Regions:
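N-terminal glycine-rich FAD/FM-binding segment characteristic of electron-transfer flavoproteins
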Residues: 1-195
Length: 195
């Protein structure tokens, strides 16, 4: 089964609005494509009650499963030097078809580096759409990029490329609840550097 990973930014102990939108978009396309939505939480030290509260909120935002790493190394703003090893470990384990970052600092800082590390296509400033089925093809996912690295608009059909896609999504309004607060959660250890 295909998987979609949505990096989920937390601010003031709640999901950042752009991350809520990214989760809602992941949920919308996953339902049409039969994919599993993984929310990735990269947190500094957090109490078990705090993690449980966030997990409930992330579940209602649209995640099927939640991957959470709470470690001192992840405290502070998202940076490739601190968050990149976790993203690489998740990508290696899940081999997602699509990785979504919310618009803003996290996507700008982490998205391009993750795409390079995973040999994935990187599409900044994007939106997602489902192209309807026709007589010759089933419905398929497309990522519409408003400004790629060359400043061009382009639409990428995921079936037409043979590698994963990392995209930063333009923010929009997210519905208040799409899933259940009791999503499956797994705690991850912070990856130790390879020697």
């Amino acid at each position: 089964m295909a998987s979609i990973v949505a990096y989920t930014e937390i601010r003031d102990a709640t999901i950042a609005p752009a991350s809520r939108f990214a989760l809602a978009e992941a949920r919308r396309i996953a339902d049409d494509l039969g994919a599993t939505v993984y929310a990735l939480l990269a947190l500094g030290p957090t109490t078990p009650d705090g993690i449980a509260a966030l997990a409930g909120e992330v579940g209602t935002a649209g995640a099927d499963r939640i991957l959470c790493c709470a470690d001192e190394a992840l405290q502070g703003p998202p940076r490739d030097a601190t968050h990149g090893p976790l993203l690489a470990a998740v990508a290696e384990r899940l081999r997602p078809t699509l990785v979504l970052f919310p618009e803003g600092d996290a996507g700008a800082e982490l998205g391009r580096a993750m795409a390079a590390r995973a040999e994935a296509a990187f599409l900044p400033d994007s939106s997602l759409e489902i192209l309807p089925a026709n007589d010759s093809e089933p419905a398929q996912l497309a990522v519409r990029c408003e400004h790629d690295d060359q400043g061009e608009k382009r639409v990428v059909r995921l079936r037409e490329i043979e590698r994963p896609v990392v995209a930063t999504l333009r923010a929009g309004a997210a519905p208040p609840a799409l899933g259940e607060p009791a999503s499956e959660m797994e705690m991850l250890n912070y990856p130790t550097p390879r020697s």
